[in-house]
Design a protein with these regions (language model features):
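Conserved SAM/AdoMet-binding glycine-rich loop
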Residues: 1-109
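Radical SAM enzyme [4Fe-4S]-AdoMet core and its adjacent flexible, acidic
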Residues: 5-25, 71-74, 134-165
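Conserved, mostly hydrophobic/aromatic
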Residues: 31, 58, 99, 119, ...
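Short acidic/polar active-site loop segments enriched in Thr and Asp
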Residues: 53, 125, 211
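Short acidic (Asp/Glu) and glycine-rich catalytic loops that position anionic groups and cofactors
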Residues: 63-64, 96, 134-139, 190
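C-terminal, non-catalytic macromolecule-binding modules
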Residues: 90, 110-152
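Terminal RNA-binding accessory module
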Residues: 142-229
């Protein structure tokens, strides 16, 4: 969780502000897992910088404020919506993923439906779905509000199916869009929005591993990026 960072009262936003002042234009950053309660306006302001890739991951766990309170989470789902809205204003169709836990203690059918509808409405690019299992030291470990395993697993499977559909839709939307891609092994790379793609270049052009290129998505299945040379 990057947003746990704190130094003299300055969180991740303060850290990124200092870093961005002291690095060159060719450096890129990927901010992966950010707990919602640690994402403030200072951090969102830094994310406007083009050196920060348009790929974000927010572990929301559930979209039910009632269940968030049971789990003693320090954020509301309205704040999560605010973050998503701002990220989409700042970046062009960023990849926004999240973590969701199905069958948290106390989760009713209504709560499960609230979470499903929230994920669908906000069109997350993809999400990791975990069936709840008790973990010692957490507020829910001794909870007596356990959900039947069968129900928990059914909810998890339904969420996974939604994630697969939305992930496919996100990939389809990239066709024809410009992107940055970092070259890796075997002529492949990872784009700024964290998609693995084959790099297409003229036969005479030597792709350098670790190099950053600009290009365009020219194929979706398989994913291919034709780079500018």
């Amino acid at each position: 969780n990057l947003t746990n960072y704190d130094h003299n009262g300055r969180g991740l936003g303060g850290l990124m502000s200092e870093i961005l002042k002291n690095v060159g234009p060719d450096i890129r950053f990927r901010l992966s897992s950010m707990e919602p309660d640690g994402v403030d306006d200072l951090l969102l302001e830094q994310i406007k910088d083009p050196r920060i890739f348009p790929h974000f991951h927010i572990p929301i766990q559930t979209a039910s404020d009632r269940v968030l309170q049971i789990a003693r989470r320090k954020y509301s789902i309205s704040h999560v919506e605010y973050i998503i809205k701002k990220l989409r204003e700042i970046k062009d169709d960023p990849f926004i993923g999240c973590d969701v836990i199905a069958g948290l203690p106390g989760e009713s059918e209504e709560d499960a439906e609230i979470t499903y509808n929230f994920l669908e409405k906000n069109n997350f690019s993809s999400f990791h779905v975990f069936p709840y299992s008790p973990r010692e030291g957490t507020p829910l470990f001794n909870s007596k509000l356990k959900i039947e395993e069968r129900v928990r697993d059914e909810r998890a499977e339904r969420l996974r199916e939604l994630s697969q559909r939305q992930s496919r839709d996100y990939i389809f939307r990239q066709n024809g869009k410009m992107t940055e891609i970092i070259a890796e092994k075997n002529g492949e790379g990872t784009t700024g929005n964290y998609l693995k793609a084959k790099i297409i270049a003229p036969p005479s052009f030597a792709i350098k591993e670790g190099e950053l290129y600009k290009g365009k998505f020219t194929s979706i299945f398989p994913l291919e990026v034709s780079i500018e040379v």
